[in-house]
């Protein structure tokens, strides 16, 4: 787990020299896109079983899990999913200038700077605005943002050229006590 790894680095005083933003490939997400519905997350053990690989080592051992992970990556059609990089959020943007905008071809992702309260993060005008991931133009909101949980908000937007889109805003909390979208 990348977050735990970075927490351990911090705890033991090891400098975090990962680039910012730190992009990585999430095996569970990519496996789901190649072998399932794109949403369901499978455990490493389940993926190994589904692919019919021999289970010749214990799970939950860093080296063994790395070997199993490599086997799955070797088997999958990586070219079909390599566009779906994940963005590590252990370190979040420090200010508006370093906020992250990433276009994945079928959706766009935004990671905000940190806010002191959940409400401030949820009310941020940039987070609540939405651009068309196809043409990049600002879209008009058709339905006001509404919450389904204390963390997740939805809205509907329209692009004059490309039609309607669902907007999703998820407020998260980091180890430094800040909230971000």
What are the residue ranges of the model-derived segments?
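DEDD superfamily 3′-5′ metal-dependent exonuclease/proofreading module
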Residues: 1-181
């Amino acid at each position: 787990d990348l977050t735990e790894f970075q927490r351990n680095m911090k705890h033991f005083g090891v400098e975090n020299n990962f680039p910012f933003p730190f992009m990585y490939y999430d095996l569970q997400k990519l496996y789901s896109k190649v072998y399932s519905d794109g949403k369901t997350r499978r455990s490493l053990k389940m993926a190994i079983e589904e692919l019919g690989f021999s289970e010749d080592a214990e799970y939950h051992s860093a080296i063994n899990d790395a070997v199993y992970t490599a086997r799955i990556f070797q088997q999958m059609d990586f070219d079909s999913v390599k566009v779906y990089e994940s963005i590590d959020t252990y370190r979040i943007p420090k200010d508006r200038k370093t906020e992250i905008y990433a276009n994945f071809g079928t959706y766009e992702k935004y990671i905000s700077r940190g806010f002191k309260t959940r409400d401030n993060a949820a009310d941020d005008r940039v987070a609540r605005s939405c651009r068309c991931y196809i043409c990049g133009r600002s879209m008009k909101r058709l339905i006001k943002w509404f919450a389904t949980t204390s963390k997740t908000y939805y809205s509907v937007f329209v692009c004059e050229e490309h039609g309607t889109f669902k907007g999703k805003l998820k407020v998260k909390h980091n180890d430094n006590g800040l909230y971000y979208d």
